[in-house]
Amino acid sequence: AYKYQSLAAGFMNRNADPFIVTVEPKPNDEPIHYNSHSGQEFNLVLEGRMMLSIDGKDLILNEGDSLYFNSKLPHGMKALDGKKVRFLAVIM
């Protein structure tokens, strides 16, 4: 499960939803939880490393890396190196 910290919950009529997301490390054989939702998503890794799987394609993102993608596609994240990963996610 991912932990979400909303950065704009009190802002009325917003066009984007920014979150700090924390993903704890899991056993390597545990499957990734996939999600999809309307719109687009921007992710910026703040701490750690993660594998981001989008529509069956796996990408490794390191601290400082970012990605912008169509969030209608099934996507899921996994922390790497046995350490948690924290990233900024902006959903539009």
Please report, for each region that a protein language model flagged, where it lies by residue:
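Glycine- and acidic-residue-biased ligand/ion/polar-headgroup-sensing regions
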Residues: 38-55, 64
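Solvent-exposed residues in well-ordered beta-strands and their adjoining turns
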Residues: 22-26, 55, 90-92
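Ligand-binding loop in jelly-roll beta-barrel domains
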Residues: 2, 14, 62, 71-92
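Jelly-roll (double-stranded beta-helix
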Residues: 6, 32, 49, 59-62, ...
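Short secondary-structure boundary/capping segments
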Residues: 11, 34-35, 42, 58-59, ...
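Short acidic-glycine-tyrosine-enriched beta hairpin
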Residues: 7, 55-71
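A short glycine-rich, His/Asp/Glu-containing loop-to-beta-strand
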Residues: 1-33, 40
